[in-house]
A protein has these predicted regions:
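Conserved small/polar residues in nucleotide/adenosyl-binding loops
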Residues: 195-201
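Ser/Thr-centric signal marking residues that sit
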Residues: 56, 174, 201
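Flexible, gly/pro- and Lys/Arg-enriched active-site loops
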Residues: 68-180, 186-189
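Residue-level marker of positions within ordered structural domains that often coincide
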Residues: 13, 177, 202
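N-terminal active-site beta-alpha-beta segment that forms phosphate/nucleotide-binding
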Residues: 1-109
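Positively charged, low-complexity intrinsically disordered regions
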Residues: 6, 40, 183-186, 195
Length: 202
């Protein structure tokens, strides 16, 4: 896991804040919002992206007018969930992430859909996080929600080391451009206009 995180970190440095990143983010989020599970969802847990992640900032603002949008907040070793009520109600928290300042949301059974960030994913739906275990502790509290892993194409690898207790994603959503190919990338070069949505194989 350590070596895979190191590899992804080097690729993310090349990719962060690039024109390609913006293009891929737009395509990935277009695929996300077109997914039936997202369309049907009333309460959605998103994430306020860091500069090396799929950019969700405008997406959050857009959908907060139509759905109840939750965002995670780092509190010690846990992620608390809070309702997003607008950019004016955000403050910079741990790791420089913008976080809502409102009340904690604990009605986990009401959450229909989760967009999950990660360092890497594989075709089985396994996810590699940043190593702090925040989502590993959060996701078991929300077993009924549809879980979509969100990532750039270079973050899809042949295999993510997984433990028996790890929770798999229901789907991995990425754009399928292979501009940043590397030895672990399982996808062939594809047309830029296409969107790749791969259901994990169990």
């Amino acid at each position: 896991k350590k070596e895979l995180r190191k590899l992804m970190a080097s690729l993310k440095i090349r990719h962060a804040s690039s024109t390609l990143q913006k293009l891929q983010s737009a395509k990935i989020l277009a695929a996300l919002e077109a997914h039936p599970a997202f369309r049907a969802a009333t309460t959605v847990l998103l994430y306020h992206s860091l500069k090396d992640e799929v950019d969700t900032h405008a997406f959050i603002r857009k959908w907060s007018n139509e759905k109840r949008i939750l965002l995670p907040v780092v509190v010690g070793d846990e992620l608390e969930l809070r309702l997003y009520t607008g950019p004016e109600d955000m403050a910079t928290g741990t790791y420089g992430i913008e976080e809502p300042v409102g009340e904690t949301f604990t009605d986990y059974a009401d959450i229909d859909f989760i967009a999950v960030p990660g360092v890497a994913f594989d075709r089985k739906g396994n996810r590699l996080g940043r190593g702090k275990g925040y989502y590993d502790r959060l996701l078991p509290r929300i077993p009924a929600a549809y879980k979509a892993g969100i990532c750039f194409p270079f973050q899809i690898v042949e295999e993510v080391p997984a433990e028996a207790f790890d929770i798999c994603m229901d789907i991995i959503i990425t754009s399928n451009e292979d501009e940043l190919s590397h030895p672990h990338h399982p996808l062939p070069p594809c047309d830029l206009s296409l969107i790749h949505i791969s259901e994990p194989t169990r």
